[in-house]
Structures are given as C-alpha cells and as structure tokens.
C-alpha cells in the first residue's frame, strides 16, 4: 500500500489562495501536516489511529485554523495570529468494516460539513442550530 502521508489542500478556494498543508512530523503514531505560513499563522492538521478495543479502530483528527492578522511594531507590519480555532474529532470504526463501509463513512463526514447543510451553515455564521 502506498503512503498517504503527503501534501493536500486543506482549504479549497477554487485554486486561488488555496491552503495546502504538507507533512511535517510523524512521531509516536501521530501524523502532522502544516501549512507553509510562519508557525504562528500556520494551519495544522494531526491524525492518529489506534486500536481502541479488540473490535474497533479510533481515528483522532485535529485541525487548527488561525485568524491571520498583522500588527505594526517599530514601523514594520508583522504577521501575528490573533486567535486560533480548533476542531477535534474522534471516529470509531469496527475493524471488520469493509472498504465500501468506510467510503460511506467518509461521504457522511463530507456531507456533515458541506456548504449549505445546517452544521456548516451554523459554523460559517458563528451561530447555533435553531
């Protein structure tokens, strides 16, 4: 099986200003991807997979999204991160799930955050579900 620890587009802006993250570290079973921005302004993704029981694998995915801003110090405009948003997700899949089962799970995840769906709309508007 080929490695899947490779660069990918995290934020798709239609090809203009896309945010790509590249492999940066793989230690203790945790894969890390980071964007090319300065460390304080970088997007970061981590993922680990572990056996949570005899019958289950648990995927833990974390995404950090920075609020990119600038600040003037001594007449020089410097980039700073005003704050960060964090997403943490745990996904448990039975070890006996087929590839088709897992592909369906991925489609469900994509649908959950698809633009226009209630959860994505609430997050995009920084509001709740009502």
From Swiss-Prot:
Family as reported in the entry's similarity comment: Belongs to the Leviviricetes capsid protein family.
Keyword Ligase tagged: no
Organism: Enterobacteria phage fr
Alphabetical GO biological process terms: regulation of translation
Region (Viral RNA-binding): 32-105
Lineage: Viruses, Riboviria, Orthornavirae, Lenarviricota, Leviviricetes
Protein name (Swiss-Prot/TrEMBL): Capsid protein
GO cellular component terms attached to this protein's record: T=3 icosahedral viral capsid
Gene3D superfamilies: MS2 Viral Coat Protein
Pfam families linked: Levi_coat
Localization (cell): Virion
